[in-house]
Swiss-Prot record:
This is Histone H1A. It is found in: Nucleus; Chromosome. Signal peptide: none annotated. The lineage of its organism: Eukaryota, Sar, Stramenopiles, Ochrophyta, Olisthodiscophyceae. The keyword DNA-binding applies. It comes from Olisthodiscus luteus.
Length: 47
């Protein structure tokens, strides 16, 4: 899946009332996806 889709899935799964932090999204993606994590892709997907 694309980073955009992974970020969207993480935000929906985390269900944080005040929004999900970048750290929480990163942790969720690392735990649930089998990809090599790239920080700059996460930042781009969040914009």
């Amino acid at each position: 899946p694309t980073y955009y889709d992974m970020v969207k899935d993480a935000i929906v799964a985390l269900k944080d009332r005040n929004g999900s932090s970048m750290q929480a999204i990163k942790k969720y993606i690392e735990a649930n996806q089998k990809v090599e994590f790239k920080q700059h892709y996460l930042r781009a997907a969040l914009k």
